Design a protein with these regions (language model features):
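N-terminal transmembrane alpha-helices
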Residues: 8-46, 59-74, 78, 103-110, ...
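Transmembrane helical elements of multi-pass membrane transporters/channels
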Residues: 19-38, 140, 151, 174, ...
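Hydrophobic residues within alpha-helical transmembrane segments
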Residues: 22, 26, 57-60, 100, ...
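Small-residue-rich hydrophobic transmembrane alpha-helices
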Residues: 51-111, 148-167, 274-338, 371-393
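Hydrophobic transmembrane alpha-helices of multi-pass small-molecule transporters
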Residues: 63-66, 110, 178-182, 208-212, ...
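Short alpha-helical transmembrane segments in multi-pass integral membrane proteins
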Residues: 1-21, 79-144, 188-244, 300-367, ...
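Short runs within selected transmembrane alpha-helices of multi-pass transporters and secretion channels
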Residues: 72, 141-159, 167-175, 196-211, ...
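Helix-terminus/linker motif at the lipid-water interface of multi-pass membrane proteins
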Residues: 33-51, 121-128, 184-191, 251-284, ...
Length: 454
């Protein structure tokens, strides 16, 4: 069988980065279909208030998903570094230890999440007319955290080895299954918002199981031995030192988005529904930035393991150009015709809602280039083994998003709510560019010293 694992330390950086990013982007878009299918079917067949209920939990969903994504990606940075260095024995050991951490964290997150949801929705001032549906939806999601952890961990392991295609295949299948289950649970069984959550959890679980079956059947270098499951204090310390800051970084961002959601909730369920629809449109086009970030984490991890700092510089240059071109194109599209996608989510007279959707898309589309920098540089720095520095950029995001959200809440300004994320991107991108040059300079000196000693 032809191996799908890929060494990212050789070949043309731009071409390799593009080829690795494309399947991740497609996979991320299909993953968005999980929530988009929920949004469309809930909005069309249950109603505006049910759509607002699902949308009002979006920031909590981001907190859960982001924490899992950041943590599993961080746990497997060391895996990519060992793979890049050609040390397969050490690579397997990192996978075994990361799996132990993932299991423990999924249990902790499930218990804490289910305990915290009701008070958290209250703190966020979720409107009374959508509270019941919002609570039902998010509790099912919390109960399915293990399913999310399974897929994200195994896909992170495969990507650490340069395989971005297989997670895509299983994700596409799961996304299609999610749509079918949405129709069954919501339309046929009339389960409402909770039915949408069940469809999402079941689909994610199946995607994770398929990844596991693939690894067992087709990736012999990931067949773990008994000794690989033995906890190593040294490895666990390194993995936690990268994984926890990456997870917390998403959490910090999520706290900022919760502040935005709180400000939005003060404007009523109609504006919440408009913001939800617009945010879904934004999330589809911005998955390219998430994919670029995922690519750079693996690319930088493998190349730092191989000691190729110049190649890392070349990679950053190539992907920054790609991201900037993409930003200009998609911004032009969503700022002109994006509002018409509102018809995907809602029916009836949408004049007021479409106007609000248009405001949101124009606000965020104007600042897509800073968003490119945030995703690419943050993940690349993390891939080189730095956990705390990118987290500081997350704090900058929190400050930018939080300050604007508080001002918007005080003035009950929808435009202010829409400008919260752009403010966060501008602050974080400026800080990350400075961090990038610092990290590159430090590693150039480090590897030059090793060369001199050799």
């Amino acid at each position: 069988m032809k191996t799908l694992q890929k060494d990212l330390t050789t070949g043309n950086p731009g071409k390799i980065i593009f080829n690795f990013t494309l399947p991740i982007f497609i996979g991320n878009v299909f993953q968005q279909f999980y929530s988009m299918a929920d949004t469309i079917i809930v909005g069309k067949f249950v109603g505006t208030k049910a759509l607002a209920a699902v949308g009002s939990t979006g920031t909590i969903m981001f907190l859960i998903n982001g924490f899992i994504l950041g943590m599993t990606a961080g746990f497997t940075v060391l895996t990519a570094q060992k793979f890049g260095a050609g040390d397969m024995k050490a690579m397997r050991k990192t996978v075994g230890n990361a799996a132990i951490l993932a299991i423990i964290m999924s249990l902790i997150m499930t218990v804490l999440g289910m305990m915290a949801m009701k008070p958290l929705l209250g703190i966020m001032k979720t409107p009374d007319d959508i509270f019941k549906d919002a609570y039902a939806y998010i509790m099912v999601i919390c109960g399915g955290i293990a399913a999310q952890m399974l897929y994200n961990f195994l896909s992170s392991v495969l990507r650490a080895l340069g395989n971005s295609k297989v997670p895509l295949y299983f994700l596409i299948l799961a996304a299609l299954l999610n749509i079918v289950l949405d129709m069954v649970f919501i339309i046929a069984f009339h389960m409402g918002a909770a039915g949408a959550a069940w469809a999402t959890v079941i689909s994610q679980g199946i995607s994770g199981i398929l990844c596991l079956v693939y690894i067992v059947k087709a990736v012999p270098i990931l067949h773990l031995h008994k000794e690989d499951w033995r906890p190593s204090g040294h490895l666990l310390k390194i993995q936690l030192a990268v994984g926890i800051p990456m997870a917390l970084q998403y959490s910090i961002t999520a706290i900022g988005t919760m502040m935005v959601q709180t400000a939005l909730n003060l404007l009523g369920s109609t504006q919440v529904a408009a913001f939800t629809a617009a945010n879904k449109i934004e999330q589809i086009v911005t998955q390219a930035y998430v994919a670029m970030g995922t690519t750079m984490a693996t690319y930088c991890a493998q190349n730092i393991g191989a000691g190729k700092i110049k190649r890392i510089r070349q990679g950053f240059k190539s992907i920054t150009i790609m991201g900037s071109i993409y930003s200009v194109v998609v911004a032009a599209i969503i700022m002109t015709v994006g509002k018409y996608m509102t018809y995907l989510f809602l029916s009836g007279d949408l004049t007021e809602i479409m106007h609000s959707v248009d405001i949101y898309l124009k606000c965020v589309g104007t600042f897509f280039i800073p968003l490119t920098v945030v995703n690419v540089y943050r993940n690349g720095i993390q891939g080189m083994g730095y956990g705390l520095l990118p987290m500081m950029a997350g704090v900058a995001e929190l400050v930018g998003r939080g300050v604007v959200a508080m001002i918007a809440a005080g003035q009950k300004s929808y435009f202010g709510v829409c400008m919260a994320s752009p403010a966060a991107w501008i602050l974080a991108s400026a800080l990350l560019i400075v961090m990038y040059y610092y990290v590159i300079h430090q590693n150039e000196k480090r590897f030059a010293k090793y060369a001199d000693e050799g």
